[in-house]
């Protein structure tokens, strides 16, 4: 893991993250103009960072937040589509991989159902090699339709990459899911605003440490007339230490080289903090000393997760018993969310 240079090597993947200024757009034409600005920025960055293999732009950087519902539906994109075609051309021209935001991607039942909040990973040939739909939209504000799975893709130089979006990253489960599928770099694109800056910076570092993985965070910056976005895009090592972090500046860029051999060596040979290995080999030292085998215990000891998998409704009722049983809150209503119990559709 190296920071401070503009290079990369056969063993390192040069990764850049961008504090893209949150755009305020209203029409498809404005969105496509912004796509061209992103594409131009990517090509320019490659000339300044010749080692750059992968660049990450924040959530909402393509379309901004459409606060008008009709504008949201009117500008919802397809994947592939006009927006991704512009990004693909830039990736081909620069010979760079890129992560881009599509907010939103048309639902299969568009326009009867809300769009998805989507990320795409595009390779240096312009091919879309991963499309991820946000599993945990930022309720109660975000009205995106939720996705249902994570992915791992072999990225530049073979580094294994998963994509997650913003509020996804507040749930340890999604990081673990990506890591256990083999992700070595988890990319978190976010359009996070104040007040939760400190918490989001902390979460990314903690999840890198807990999952023995690299983390790349790209966050929006600036003010869009509604929210103030705190930036702090960052690259974090698999030991939880920050390699590089921007401030709050609009269009700030950070860059680091992520060693492929280092993370694979650590996962194979580290012991006391090898969290992925130890989770499925619980207590192996004591089990070995007892003469009960030398691989520890693999069974899941966490009753809540067992219940969630076998009886999701009962797990939901258990959560509601310690929180609330309505999605809305009477003292702080958001939109039309119900504040009284309703029947499931």
UniProtKB/Swiss-Prot annotation:
InterPro entries: Aliph_Amidase/BUP (IPR050345), Aliphatic_amidase (IPR023719), C-N_Hydrolase (IPR003010), C-N_Hydrolase_sf (IPR036526). It catalyses: a monocarboxylic acid amide + H2O = a monocarboxylate + NH4(+). The active site is at residues 59, 134, 166. Keywords: Hydrolase. It is an enzyme of class 3 (hydrolase). SUPFAM superfamilies: Carbon-nitrogen hydrolase (SSF56317). One of its GO terms (molecular function) is amidase activity. Its EC number is 3.5.1.4. Residues 13-260 form the CN hydrolase domain. Transmembrane segments: none annotated. Belongs to the carbon-nitrogen hydrolase superfamily. Aliphatic amidase family. Catalyzes the hydrolysis of short-chain aliphatic amides to their corresponding organic acids with release of ammonia. This is Aliphatic amidase. It comes from Nocardia farcinica (strain IFM 10152). The gene is amiE.
């Amino acid at each position: 893991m190296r920071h401070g240079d503009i290079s990369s090597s056969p063993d390192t993947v040069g990764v850049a993250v961008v504090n893209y200024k949150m755009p305020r757009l209203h029409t498809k034409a404005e969105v496509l103009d912004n796509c061209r600005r992103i594409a131009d920025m990517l090509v320019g960055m490659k000339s300044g960072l010749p080692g750059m293999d992968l660049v990450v732009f924040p959530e909402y950087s393509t379309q901004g937040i459409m606060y008008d519902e009709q504008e949201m539906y009117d500008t919802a994109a397809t994947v592939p589509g006009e927006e991704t075609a512009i990004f693909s051309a830039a990736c081909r021209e620069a010979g760079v991989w890129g992560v881009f935001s599509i907010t939103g991607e048309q639902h299969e039942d568009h326009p009867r159902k809300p769009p998805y909040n989507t990320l795409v990973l595009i390779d240096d040939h312009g091919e879309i090699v991963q499309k991820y739909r946000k599993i945990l939209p930022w309720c109660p504000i975000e009205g995106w339709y939720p996705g249902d799975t994570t992915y791992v893709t072999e990225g530049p130089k073979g580094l294994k990459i998963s994509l997650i979006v913003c509020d996804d990253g507040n749930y340890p489960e999604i990081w673990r899911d990506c890591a256990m599928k083999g992700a070595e770099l988890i990319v978190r694109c976010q359009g996070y605003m104040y007040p939760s800056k400190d918490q989001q910076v902390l979460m990314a570092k903690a999840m890198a440490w807990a999952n023995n993985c690299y983390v790349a965070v790209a966050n929006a910056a600036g003010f869009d007339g509604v929210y103030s976005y705190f930036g702090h895009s960052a690259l974090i090592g698999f030991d939880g230490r920050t390699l590089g972090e921007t401030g709050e500046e609009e269009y700030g860029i950070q860059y680091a080289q992520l060693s492929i051999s280092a993370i694979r060596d650590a996962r194979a040979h580290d012991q006391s903090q090898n969290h992925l290995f130890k989770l499925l080999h619980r207590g192996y030292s004591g089990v070995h000393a007892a003469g009960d085998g030398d691989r520890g215990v693999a069974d899941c000891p966490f009753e809540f997760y067992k219940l969630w998998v076998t009886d999701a409704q009962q797990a939901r009722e258990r959560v509601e018993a310690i929180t609330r049983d309505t999605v809305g809150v009477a003292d702080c209503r958001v939109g039309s969310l119900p504040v009284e119990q309703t029947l499931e559709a």
